[in-house]
Regions:
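Membrane-interface helix-boundary motifs at transmembrane edges
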Residues: 21-26, 87-101, 151-163, 211-216
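Membrane-proximal helix-loop-helix units in multi-pass membrane proteins
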Residues: 107-163
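N-terminal topogenic module of multi-pass integral membrane proteins
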Residues: 2-93
C-alpha cells in the first residue's frame, strides 16, 4: 500500500510539473512569436522609410541609394522572423499540410535572393528582370503558404472566419489601391507587411492565450488531485 501511495504521489507530481511546463512553454512561444512579428514591422518601417516610400520601392532604396547591405539584412531578418513565427503558429493549431511549411521555405529563399540580386535596369537589365521574377515568386510563395492556412483556420475556428477573410481583403484592396494610385512604390510593400504583421500578432495573442488558459486549467486540476492525496 505504501509503495502504491508513493507511486501515485510521484505520478501526481509529474502531472503537475508537466502541466506547469506546458504553461511556461506556451507563454514563451507567445512572447517570441509576437516579438518576432514586431521586429518584422519595425525593421520594415525603418528600412522602407530610409527614402520617401511614396516614390521609391524597397528595391530602389537598396540599389540606387547605397543601402544594398541594409536591404539584404532586412530581407534575411524578415524572412527568418516570419518563417519561425508562422511555423510555431502551424504547430499550435495542428496545421499539418506540408504546402504551408514548403511555401514559407520558398518565400524566405525568394525574398533573400531578391535582395541579393542587383536591380539597376539601365546597367544590368538581365538581373533587373530576374529580380522582378524572384519578387513575383516570393509573393506567390507567401500566398501558397498562408492563404490556405487562413481558410483552414477559419473552418476550424468559425468565429475567426469573417475576420480572416476581411483582413486578407483589407491587405489585398489596400495593396491594389496603392498600386493604382502610386504605382509600384514602397507604400505597397509597407502596406503588405504592416497588414500581415498585425494580423499575425492578433492571431498569436488570441490563440496562444486560449491554449495557455487550457493548460492552466489542467495545472489547477493536477494540483487539486495532488492536494487531495
Amino acid at each position: 500500500m505504501k509503495n502504491q501511495s508513493k507511486t501515485s504521489s510521484i505520478s501526481q507530481n509529474t502531472n503537475v510539473l508537466e502541466a506547469l511546463n506546458d504553461v511556461l512553454k506556451l507563454r514563451r512561444e507567445r512572447f517570441w512569436t509576437i516579438t518576432l512579428m514586431l521586429i518584422v514591422i519595425f525593421a520594415t518601417t525603418l528600412y522602407g522609410t530610409l527614402r520617401n516610400p511614396f516614390i521609391n520601392t524597397f528595391s530602389k532604396i537598396g540599389n540606387y541609394f547605397g543601402y544594398r547591405v541594409l536591404y539584404i539584412i532586412w530581407a534575411i531578418t524578415v524572412s527568418i522572423c516570419i518563417h519561425i513565427s508562422s511555423i510555431l503558429l502551424f504547430k499550435l493549431t495542428d496545421y499539418s499540410k506540408k504546402m504551408g511549411s514548403l511555401g514559407l521555405l520558398f518565400a524566405s529563399f525568394f525574398l533573400i535572393v531578391t535582395a541579393i540580386i542587383p536591380s539597376i535596369k539601365e546597367q544590368l537589365p538581365f538581373w533587373h528582370i530576374l529580380h522582378k521574377w524572384t519578387t513575383f515568386f516570393y509573393v506567390m510563395s507567401m500566398i501558397t503558404a498562408l492563404h490556405p492556412f487562413f481558410v483552414w483556420l477559419g473552418r476550424k475556428i468559425p468565429r475567426l472566419k469573417v475576420l480572416l477573410r476581411n483582413w486578407q481583403l483589407f491587405i489585398l484592396i489596400g495593396s491594389i489601391t496603392s498600386l493604382l494610385i502610386q504605382g509600384q512604390t514602397g507604400i505597397f510593400e509597407l502596406w503588405f507587411f504592416w497588414g500581415l504583421g498585425t494580423l499575425m500578432i492578433y492571431l498569436f495573442w488570441i490563440l496562444f492565450t486560449e491554449k495557455i488558459e487550457e493548460a492552466e486549467q489542467h495545472e489547477h486540476i493536477a494540483e487539486k488531485e495532488k492536494n487531495r492525496s
